[in-house]
Each structure stands twice: as C-alpha cells, then as structure tokens.
Amino acid sequence: MRLLCGLWLWLSLLKVLQAQTPTPLPLPPPMQSFQGNQFQGEWFVLGLAGNSFRPEHRALLNAFTATFELSDDGRFEVWNAMTRGQHCDTWSYVLIPAAQPGQFTVDHGVEPGADREETRVVDSDYTQFALMLSRRHTSRLAVLRISLLGRSWLLPPGTLDQFICLGRAQGLSDDNIVFPDVTGWSPQASVC
C-alpha cells in the first residue's frame, strides 16, 4: 500500500511541476532574405532583452562590440569585446547555418552534451541595425535573449520600439530589458 501511495504522490508532484513550467512561445521566423555577406562586420550591442535579465543587471552591462566574420562554408565566427575599466573581456563562438537562411545553431566550443542554443536574425537593414533572437535550452528551462545591434550608436526611427515589441511578443517585460552603460565609453582599439 505504501508503494502505491508513494507512486501516486510522485506522479501528482510530477504533474504539478509540469504545469508550472511555462511552454516557450514560438520564435518569430528568421529574416527571409538574409544575406550573410552584408551582415558580416562589426556591430555595437545597443540593447539586450531576455528572461534571465533583471533590473539589477543593468549596472553590470558595459558597452561592447560583436564582430561577425563569414567563412566560405556559411559559418560565422563571432568575437565579442567588452571594456571593463582598463581591461577587455573577450569571448567567441561559431554560428553554424541551419535549414533556413538567417537561422543558426551556436557552437561555444565546449564539450559534447552542452546546452543546445539556436539563434536567428529576425530583421536587419545591414547598414544601421539588426535584431537577433537566441534561445538556449537547458535541462530545466529555455533561456531567451534578444540583441539590438547597430553599426553606430544612432538607430533609425522606430528601431527601439521594434526591439521592445519583439521582447514583449516573447513574453518579456520592461524589467527584462537592459541597455549598456555608455558613460565615458568610447571605442579604443588599444584596449580591446
């Protein structure tokens, strides 16, 4: 009898936990006319939105750049550089083309079995702005991140609204949006 009660309790808890795990919203499609050769180059990361960001993270985000280099096989090598005081933090990864143009899987260069991440370019005019959306699947949840990229710090009218609306369509609130602190920041090749 105890075994039966224990099994019933375990199954009940499993149902409760499954009900509390939100189903991720469907991702918007990647940009249909994506052109990798026009997308490559240096971008400033002007804003980030994600379900793991909180208001207290705003002070931690400094301005940074992302450089996309297109290889012959359609992969992008991506290098990021963020200044923190007098030193530079850098990290890199590879975007591997998926079935649709503008859609990629992310290779962080870690061991097999690491969390799976997919990313896509949702919109871009290639010369001024780009919106990218990434979703990383962990064993417990899906981590969503939306990046607002600009070739300069000046965005076309409506781009910021488009970024915020994309976040809201993915169930994010204004508290999930962070912008880098650019106080006193200027790109210096000697630092990074």
From Swiss-Prot:
Gene Ontology molecular function: retinoic acid binding
Alphabetically ordered keywords of this record: Disulfide bond, Secreted, Signal, Transport
Pfam families, A to Z: Lipocalin (PF00061)
Disulfide bond in keyword set: yes
Disulfide-bond pairs as recorded: 88-192
Signal peptide (UniProt feature, chain positions): 1-19
GO cellular component: extracellular region; extracellular space
Quaternary data: Monomer.
Name of the molecule in the record: Epididymal-specific lipocalin-12
Lineage: Eukaryota, Metazoa, Chordata, Craniata, Vertebrata
